[in-house]
């Protein structure tokens, strides 16, 4: 009973004191002092260089962001240049793969068919009795400073021509496109004239009909006279057009046209501009030459030499690794036998080729001398990077024994008959005569030379037609 009264009295006393203003101010001042104490501690920590400790989860979340490096800028990506590597299937030391001109392909097809029919390609009038035809693609640009185009220059790098070759002809082939707009009223006869650059020498001139729109086609100019005096490094030819029938009408082009003299026609309107042209429509210089037999395979030596000089055994630049091992020595009595050896980078292919085609030579055949098959694949030899066509052909070879008596179809020489007779009497004293080719025929090869020019060449004595004892 006394306890309940004491508790009730305490409650009334507390409520009475809470209503007094002095007690409320004391409580407020105590709470504010605690707040000021907290703020003072915070300011003191800032002055001393210490930041208030944040919650742990915030620190751990922010710490990886502070340590993480900023990502690279997107615009910096294109500035990174990948290491330059030669493209696949490109011959060493060359530029991009050369696309043969359709004109050179047609020459190869025509002369190859003639050879199969037994006709020598050098007898064709178009070949000019040449066994080598080299094509050079125009490297010039349009002269944009002259509008309209009055003169068109054509530049050709002819440094790969050898002074050992006899030059028998040269022609410039220009593709004339159909004009985009019809011609205006004719001002007289229209003539095309071809000059050597920086020279008044007129190589050839021809007339065009100004009445009708010309059809697209090839204009062929004889430039043999312009190529002969050149030092065979670079040939520059210039095409002009003029109104008039005189051969030197184009020379009056530099004069200011009078009231009765129309300006020279625009070569672009005649279809001779370089813009919007396919590779097959570019100007082509075709040189006809006749090579001596001893220099027919000189380009093979150049091909193998340029490949070993430019690229090392590991595919890197020159000097990046140890030099390649020397090629095997040629067989005795065989001149330039190393020309038929594939490049160092093709040795695995050569080994496979030899193991596949050399099994029949393990045992000496006792058959009489006759012609046997021999299939040659230039791709297996490693020459497909510069030989365009053919990639393979049937060469044949001679195999067998020349025993006594010799057959008449073997066409033996008197010396072979005596040698065979001596061998039959005493095999230890005299070796038998040899089974060798007695008649060989040529083949046509289309290839890329060291200057990336497409060349047609007729190679003599490439196919065995008959065998005999010698």
Swiss-Prot record:
InterPro entries named among the record's database cross-references: Cystine-knot_cytokine, TGF-b_C, TGF-b_propeptide, TGF-beta-rel, TGFb_CS
SUPFAM superfamilies assigned: Cystine-knot cytokines
UniProt keywords, alphabetically: Apoptosis, Cleavage on pair of basic residues, Cytokine, Developmental protein, Disulfide bond, Glycoprotein, Growth factor, Secreted, Signal
Keyword Disulfide bond tagged: yes
A Pfam entry, by short name: TGFb_propeptide
Glycosylation site positions: 120
Disulfide pairings: 369-435, 398-467, 402-469
Description of how the protein assembles with itself and partners: Homodimer; disulfide-linked.
Protein family: Belongs to the TGF-beta family.
The protein, known as: Growth/differentiation factor 6
Organism (species): Bos taurus (Bovine)
């Amino acid at each position: 009973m006394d306890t309940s009264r004491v508790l009730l009295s305490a409650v009334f006393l507390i409520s009475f004191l809470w209503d007094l203003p002095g007690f409320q101010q004391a409580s407020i001042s105590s709470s504010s002092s605690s707040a000021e104490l907290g703020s003072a501690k915070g300011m003191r920590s800032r002055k001393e260089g210490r930041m208030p400790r944040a919650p742990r989860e915030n620190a751990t979340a922010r710490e990886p962001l502070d340590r993480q490096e900023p990502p690279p800028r997107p615009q910096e990506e294109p500035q990174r240049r990948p290491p330059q590597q030669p493209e696949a299937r490109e011959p060493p030391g060359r530029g991009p793969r050369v696309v043969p001109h359709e004109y050179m392909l047609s020459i190869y097809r025509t002369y190859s068919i003639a050879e199969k029919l037994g006709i020598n390609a050098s007898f064709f009038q178009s070949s000019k009795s040449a066994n080598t035809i080299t094509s050079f693609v125009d490297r010039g640009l349009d002269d944009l400073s002259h509008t309209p185009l009055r003169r068109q220059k054509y530049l050709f790098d002819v440094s790969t021509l050898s002074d050992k070759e006899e030059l028998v002809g040269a022609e410039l082939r220009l593709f004339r496109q159909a004009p985009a707009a019809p011609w205006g009223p004719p001002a007289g006869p229209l003539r095309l004239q071809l000059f050597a650059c920086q020279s008044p020498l007129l190589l050839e001139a021809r007339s065009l009909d100004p009445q009708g729109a010309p059809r697209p086609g090839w204009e062929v100019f004889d430039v043999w006279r312009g190529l002969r005096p050149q030092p065979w490094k670079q040939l520059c030819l210039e095409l002009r057009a003029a109104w008039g029938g005189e051969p030197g009408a184009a020379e009056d082009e530099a004069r200011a046209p009078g009231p009765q003299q129309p300006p020279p026609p625009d070569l672009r309107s005649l279809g001779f501009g370089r813009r919007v042209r396919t590779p097959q429509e570019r100007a082509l210089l075709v040189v006809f030459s006749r090579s001596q037999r001893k220099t027919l395979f000189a380009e093979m030596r150049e091909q193998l030499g340029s490949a070993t000089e430019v690229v090392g055994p590991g595919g890197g630049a020159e000097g990046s690794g140890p030099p390649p091992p020397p090629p095997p020595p040629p067989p005795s009595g065989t001149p330039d036998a190393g020309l038929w050896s594939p490049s160092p980078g093709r040795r695995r292919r050569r080994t496979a080729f030899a193991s596949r085609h050399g099994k029949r030579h393990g045992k000496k055949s006792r058959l009489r001398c006759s012609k046997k098959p021999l299939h040659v694949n230039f791709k297996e030899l490693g020459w497909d990077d510069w030989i365009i066509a053919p990639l393979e052909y049937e060469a044949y070879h001679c195999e067998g024994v020349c025993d006594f008596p010799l057959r008449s179809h073997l066409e033996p020489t008197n010396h072979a008959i005596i040698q065979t007779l001596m061998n039959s009497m005493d095999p230890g004293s005299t070796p038998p005569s040899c089974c060798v080719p007695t008649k060989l025929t040529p083949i046509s090869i289309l290839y890329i030379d060291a200057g990336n020019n497409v060349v047609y060449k007729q190679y003599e004595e490439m196919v065995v037609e008959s065998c005999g004892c010698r």
